[in-house]
């Protein structure tokens, strides 16, 4: 693990929400690294600030990889209704932003066959959000 990744992982547990938001953005490209994935799910389900949830979901959606969408799907399956709304808002922000998030639907298609039921369920929600982005 690089020193940069270690530092970013430390920021993911910072008491400052702004640092946690930055960590979510910075870790999104490392969604396939187990330590980063664990931290990212924690940020998606951040109990203290919805900005962390929203902006981490947006960053992961912009990545559009199967690994990044899997993490959002896991969080969607675990989230209460309020947190799920903020996850959806983050996904929507990425889909409607410059360049959109072209890989999301393809990733959801792959995750629809995932052996983990929670991932399949979450991916179905994300696919519905992507197909009808409000």
Q: Predicted regions: what is each one?
A:
Residues 1-11, 31-45, 65-77, 99-112, ...:
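Amphipathic alpha-helical scaffolding segments comprising HEAT/armadillo-like alpha-solenoid repeats
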Residues 4-28:
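Long, hydrophobic N-terminal alpha-helical segment
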Residues 15-16, 48-49, 79-84, 115-117:
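Short inter-helical turns and helix N-cap capping residues of alpha-solenoid HEAT/ARM repeat scaffolds
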Residues 21-22, 44-61:
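Hydrophobic alpha-helical segments that drive targeting, anchoring, or assembly
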Residues 28, 61, 92-96, 128:
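Structural signature of alpha-helical solenoid repeat scaffolds
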Residues 71-90:
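Mid-chain, well-packed structural core segment of small domains
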Residues 121-134:
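Short, charged, intrinsically disordered terminal tails
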């Amino acid at each position: 693990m690089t020193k940069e990744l270690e530092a970013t992982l430390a920021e993911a547990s910072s008491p400052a929400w702004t640092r946690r938001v930055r960590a979510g953005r910075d870790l999104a490209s490392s969604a396939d690294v187990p330590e980063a994935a664990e931290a990212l799910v924690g940020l998606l389900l951040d109990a203290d600030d919805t900005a962390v949830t929203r902006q981490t979901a947006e960053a992961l959606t912009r990545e559009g990889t199967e690994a990044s969408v899997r993490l959002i799907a896991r969080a969607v399956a675990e989230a209460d209704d309020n947190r799920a709304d903020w996850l959806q808002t983050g996904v929507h922000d990425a889909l409607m932003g410059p360049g959109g998030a072209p890989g999301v639907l393809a990733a959801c298609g792959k995750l629809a066959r995932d052996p983990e039921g929670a991932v399949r369920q979450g991916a179905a929600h994300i696919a519905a959000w992507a197909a009808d982005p409000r």
